[in-house]
UniProtKB/Swiss-Prot annotation:
ATP binds at residues 7-20, 102, 172, 197. Keywords: ATP-binding, Cytoplasm, Ligase, Nucleotide-binding, RNA-binding, tRNA processing, tRNA-binding. InterPro entries: Rossmann-like_a/b/a_fold, tRNA(Met)_cyd_acetate_ligase. GO terms for molecular function: ATP binding; ligase activity, forming carbon-nitrogen bonds; tRNA binding. It is found in: Cytoplasm. This is tRNA(Met) cytidine acetate ligase. Its main location: cytoplasm. GO terms for cellular component: cytoplasm. GO terms for biological process: tRNA modification. Catalyzes the formation of N(4)-acetylcytidine (ac(4)C) at the wobble position of elongator tRNA(Met), using acetate and ATP as substrates. First activates an acetate ion to form acetyladenylate (Ac-AMP) and then transfers the acetyl group to tRNA to form ac(4)C34. Transmembrane segments: none annotated. The keyword tRNA-binding applies. HAMAP family: TmcAL.
Length: 422
């Protein structure tokens, strides 16, 4: 039977995720599911609502068979790097047949057409891209305009400019395009399948329906409490969230990050801040000025934001600074791609999948950290140790956000065992 791969954050697992999981199984006729999941920080540049171990329990109880952690160095990057890291891990398992993802369009073919253009970068497309960048547009905006211009000027594309334009406006379509691009990049045989998303959109804050966005669910929890979102999440998700909240481990207090981030920024010089990915050409001064004129994280981001700098991009950059992941660190780690499978949890089917992965893959399976990381060292020349050290640091920082101070001890990655639902 085919094996299904999904890439997700489960922040938290909700009814829309369950629909996606069931549909994915039906469409692909798969009987086993491998999930690549972000750790304690998500791609938006925020801490997850609850930690990766609780979210792993949710995934297992809701029907996922094996959960592998996406390393931090891919988890808090742009959609392109996020997708590349996760897709590469699925490919490296040597067991996955399908990658199924939710999208606003649900049209795999049109996403493949766009992904192919962006991956191959035909000559005319590259010329348009250079032109728009030289006009001062941000790279994402320049790429979007270049794509539409290329489609308009090219005869053999089976979709209209308007159809392509509609597709690339939606966040899950964009992420799906990046997944397919990554499959092209690594020459994977995994088949991409888009499923049309049900319910409210990605940015919707409505809690009126059974299927709504994770954004709305998180907002509801923070502002109105857990019971306000009960209809939008599965019973097992509700149970686990309730347990975590009662145990003082959630919802995490995001505002506790602000002093650490502001302190880090205020210590930096323009020369130092230029070492971080995407902070150049005067942006370093914008970040530093904002740091000295802001007393909260929200105020800091508002003072940095402009038409070319989105809220999420700024949040990701602030996490890079907090974790001291410089551009050169990313470049060193990017050269070889993901170096390991960090196993967060599995069930009986997942146990069989692990046996197959162990036989077929060149990457090590990590179920216990100590044999692979004797000492946390983010400057290690060993790329596995370097990447794992950032994962450990992110958990150490995350634990400081628990509501109950007694739960905030560090080095949890060495202490918490793999979660088994057997």
């Amino acid at each position: 039977m085919p094996v299904l791969g999904i890439i997700t954050e489960y922040n938290p697992f909700h009814n829309g995720h369950l629909y996606h999981l069931n549909q994915a199984r039906t469409i692909t006729d798969s009987n086993a599911v491998i999930c690549i999941m972000n750790g304690n920080f998500v791609q938006r540049g925020e801490p997850a609502l609850i930690d990766k171990w609780a979210r792993t329990r949710m995934a297992l109880k809701n029907g996922v068979d094996l959960i592998i952690e996406l390393p931090l160095i891919y988890g808090i990057r742009s959609a392109e790097y996020f997708a590349y890291g996760a897709v590469t891990l699925l490919e490296e398992t040597k067991t996955v047949d399908y990658l199924v993802f939710g999208s606003e369009s649900g049209n795999t073919d049109i996403l493949k057409v766009v992904a192919r253009i962006l991956y191959e970068e035909p000559h005319n497309f590259k010329q348009y891209l250079k032109k728009y960048i030289s006009q001062g547009l941000s790279f994402p905006r320049a790429r979007e305009k270049a794509l539409l211009k290329y489609v308009q000027q090219t005869d053999n594309i089976p979709y209209s400019v308007n159809e392509i334009a509609d597709v690339i406006k939606q966040p899950n379509n964009i992420l799906g395009i990046e997944y397919i691009k990554a499959l092209f990049r690594i020459n994977s045989t995994i088949k991409p399948v888009a499923i049309r998303r049900k319910g409210k959109g990605y940015h919707s804050h409505s809690l009126e329906t059974k299927i709504t966005s994770a954004t709305a669910i998180r907002k509801g929890i923070y502002e109105q409490g857990l019971n306000s979102v009960k209809q939008a999440i599965t019973p097992v998700t509700y149970k686990i969230l309730k347990e975590e909240f009662e145990n003082g481990k959630g919802p995490v207090q995001k505002q506790l990050l602000q002093h650490a981030i502001l302190a880090e920024l205020r210590k930096l010089t323009p020369e130092k801040i230029r070492q971080y990915e995407g902070v150049k050409n005067g942006l370093e001064y914008r970040f530093l000025e904002a740091a000295h004129n802001s007393g909260t994280l929200t105020g800091l981001i508002e003072n940095i934001k402009n038409k070319n700098l989105t809220w999420t991009r700024i949040q990701r950059t602030l996490l890079h600074i907090l974790f001291n992941i410089r551009e050169k660190d990313f470049r060193i780690l990017d050269k070889k791609g993901p170096r390991y499978f960090r196993v967060l949890g599995f069930n009986k089917k997942g146990e069989k999948l692990l046996s197959k992965i162990k036989q077929n893959s060149r990457l090590p399976l990590i179920t216990h950290l100590k044999p692979h990381l004797k000492q946390v060292n983010r400057n290690s020349l060993n790329l596995l140790e370097k990447s794992l050290s950032y994962d450990v640091l992110s958990s150490d920082m995350y634990s400081l956000l628990y509501p109950d101070p007694s739960k905030r001890r560090g080095r949890k990655d060495f202490l918490i065992p793999v979660i088994k639902n057997i």
